[in-house]
Swiss-Prot record:
<dbReference type="GO" id="GO:0016020">
    <property type="term" value="C:membrane"/>
</dbReference>
<feature type="modified residue" description="N6-acetyllysine">
    <location>
        <position position="113"/>
    </location>
</feature>
<feature type="cross-link" description="Glycyl lysine isopeptide (Lys-Gly) (interchain with G-Cter in ubiquitin)">
    <location>
        <position position="107"/>
    </location>
</feature>
<dbReference type="GO" id="GO:0030666">
    <property type="term" value="C:endocytic vesicle membrane"/>
</dbReference>
<feature type="domain" description="Ubiquitin-like">
    <location>
        <begin position="1"/>
        <end position="76"/>
    </location>
</feature>
<feature type="zinc finger region" description="C4-type">
    <location>
        <begin position="121"/>
        <end position="144"/>
    </location>
</feature>
<feature type="modified residue" description="Phosphoserine; by PINK1">
    <location>
        <position position="65"/>
    </location>
</feature>
<keyword id="KW-0479">Metal-binding</keyword>
<dbReference type="InterPro" id="IPR000626">
    <property type="entry name" value="Ubiquitin-like_dom"/>
</dbReference>
<dbReference type="GO" id="GO:0070062">
    <property type="term" value="C:extracellular exosome"/>
</dbReference>
<dbReference type="GO" id="GO:0008270">
    <property type="term" value="F:zinc ion binding"/>
</dbReference>
<dbReference type="Pfam" id="PF01599">
    <property type="entry name" value="Ribosomal_S27"/>
</dbReference>
<dbReference type="InterPro" id="IPR011332">
    <property type="entry name" value="Ribosomal_zn-bd"/>
</dbReference>
<dbReference type="InterPro" id="IPR038582">
    <property type="entry name" value="Ribosomal_eS31_euk-type_sf"/>
</dbReference>
<feature type="modified residue" description="N6-acetyllysine">
    <location>
        <position position="152"/>
    </location>
</feature>
<feature type="cross-link" description="Glycyl lysine isopeptide (Gly-Lys) (interchain with K-? in acceptor proteins)">
    <location>
        <position position="76"/>
    </location>
</feature>
<dbReference type="GO" id="GO:0032040">
    <property type="term" value="C:small-subunit processome"/>
</dbReference>
Length: 156
C-alpha cells in the first residue's frame, strides 16, 4: 500500500509499505529517500507520536494516509545550578521593645513635680516629642543633626 509523509518544508514523500511494517522500517525508508537519520525523526499520525516498536496497523494507518515528519529536538532548557552560599544568611536586626520606655525621659520627685531628664529638640523639622541624645559633652538630635555643645571651664 502507499502512504504519504509530509515534511516540515512542505514536501510530500510517497512510500510503498505494508500494514505489518514497523515504524522503524518506515523511518529507514525515509532515511533512504531524504537522508535524515531515524533517531532524529518523529512521525506523527492523528496527533499522536508513533513509537518505533509498533506496526502501521496498530495505529490504524491505511492506504493513502498522511504521516507528518518532524525532527527531534535534543535537550531542552539549560539546567540551572542551585546556588550554594558559603556563609549563612544574616538575620535582620530586630528592635527590642521596652515597656513604658517613656519613663526614662522624665523624673517625678517626692512632691509630684515632673522634670525632663532629656532635652526636647527645638527644631521645627522634628516637632514635639523628639528628644535629643545626651552625650558627655553635648546634646544631639538624631533626626535633624542639631547639636548643642557644653561649655567646659578651661584649666589655667
Amino acid at each position: 500500500m502507499q502512504i504519504f509523509v509530509k515534511t516540515l518544508t512542505g514536501k510530500t514523500i510517497t512510500l510503498e509499505v505494508e500494514p505489518s511494517d514497523t515504524i522503524e522500517n518506515v523511518k529507514a525508508k525515509i532515511q533512504d529517500k531524504e537522508g535524515i537519520p531515524p533517531d532524529q525523526q518523529r512521525l506523527i499520525f492523528a496527533g499522536k507520536q508513533l513509537e518505533d516498536g509498533r506496526t502501521l496497523s496498530d495505529y490504524n494507518i491505511q492506504k493513502e494516509s498522511t504521516l507528518h515528519l518532524v525532527l527531534r529536538l535534543r535537550g531542552g532548557a539549560k539546567k540551572r545550578k542551585k546556588k550554594s552560599y558559603t556563609t549563612p544568611k544574616k538575620n535582620k536586626h530586630k528592635r527590642k521593645k521596652v515597656k513604658l520606655a517613656v519613663l526614662k525621659y522624665y523624673k517625678v520627685d517626692e512632691n509630684g513635680k515632673i522634670s525632663r531628664l532629656r532635652r526636647e529638640c527645638p527644631s521645627d523639622e522634628c516637632g514635639a516629642g523628639v528628644f535629643m541624645a545626651s552625650h558627655f559633652d553635648r546634646h544631639y538630635c538624631g533626626k535633624c543633626c542639631l547639636t548643642y555643645c557644653f561649655n567646659k571651664p578651661e584649666d589655667k
